[in-house]
């Protein structure tokens, strides 16, 4: 039996990178997936690939910093596929990369909203739907930046990603006894457009004990673990998938 047979999942930031790899893997493992990104055309490309592979998918384009987008995602899960069991809140943005004192209030607000407020807006909509099914799994894509390591010029991003652990702990305290598990996945460098050019990827690889960055599919496998029955007693936790960065920093 497939790990996510008869499950329904929402995945944000699904048009590229970790989100796209996660959407395709979850569909392969039997889940019906509601996928989201801002760009409708790129999102439809992912949906088409999933359909061609025999998967069930429904794309919903929209900005995750807007509450109405999350309402549409959850409504689609309920009306198209009958409920919601899993949410992978992956969408985010690095934003301005400069020393902290040089960051404008507007730049700060953008990064916090894109990475933290968007996640709050997501779970505020997702959790009530999960409770109707007796529980579910929420996964936040955080980062090793701000949690195990500070990176020059990335104070805003690191702060936002570290704060996701506060959401994880709060959801666990409020809802774990009702069957909703929340966990964070903390990647190191990953070969995605967000990782930058070849020189930046080489620099990131040097931060990790494994001396390479991850493929998006490797992070999708970790997200699958946190979303599946394999992690049924894992709640309120941070799973580092950082190539050993936390061990050698």
Segments the model singles out, each with a brief description of its role:
Residues 8, 15-16:
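Conserved glycine-rich cofactor-binding loop
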Residues 94-97, 224, 235-249:
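Short C-terminal tail/terminal secondary-structure segment
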Residues 98-100, 107-112, 204:
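Substrate-binding pocket helix/loop in short-chain dehydrogenase/reductase
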Residues 123, 160, 168:
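Active-site helix of classical SDR
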Residues 128, 147, 169, 173-177, ...:
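Alpha-helical segment proximal to the catalytic Tyr-Lys
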Residues 143:
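Residue(s) in the substrate-gating loop at a strand-loop-helix junction
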Residues 208-219, 230:
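A conserved structural motif in NAD(P)-dependent oxidoreductases
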């Amino acid at each position: 039996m497939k790990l996510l047979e008869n499950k329904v999942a929402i995945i944000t930031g699904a048009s590229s990178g970790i989100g796209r790899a996660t959407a395709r893997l979850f569909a392969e493992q039997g889940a019906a997936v509601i996928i989201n990104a801002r760009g409708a055309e790129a999102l439809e490309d992912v949906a088409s690939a999933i359909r061609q592979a025999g998967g069930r998918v429904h794309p919903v384009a929209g900005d995750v910093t807007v509450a109405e987008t999350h309402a549409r995602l959850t409504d689609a899960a309920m009306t198209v596929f009958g409920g919601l069991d899993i949410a992978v809140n992956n969408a985010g943005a690095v934003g301005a990369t400069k020393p902290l004192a040089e960051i404008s209030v507007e730049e700060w607000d953008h990064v916090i909203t894109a990475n933290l407020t968007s996640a709050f807006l997501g779970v505020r909509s997702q959790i009530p739907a999960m409770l109707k099914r007796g529980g579910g799994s929420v996964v936040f894509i955080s980062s090793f930046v701000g949690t195990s390591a500070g990176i020059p010029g990335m104070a805003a991003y690191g702060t936002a990603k570290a704060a996701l652990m506060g959401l994880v702990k709060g959801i666990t305290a409020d809802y774990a006894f009702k069957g909703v598990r929340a966990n964070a996945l903390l990647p190191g460098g990953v070969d995605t457009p967000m990782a930058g050019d070849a020189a930046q990827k080489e620099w990131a690889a040097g931060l990790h004990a494994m001396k390479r960055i991850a493929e998006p599919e490797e992070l999708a496998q970790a997200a699958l673990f946190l979303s599946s029955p394999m992690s049924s007693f894992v709640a309120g936790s941070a799973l580092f998938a950082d190539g050993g960065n936390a061990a050698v920093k």
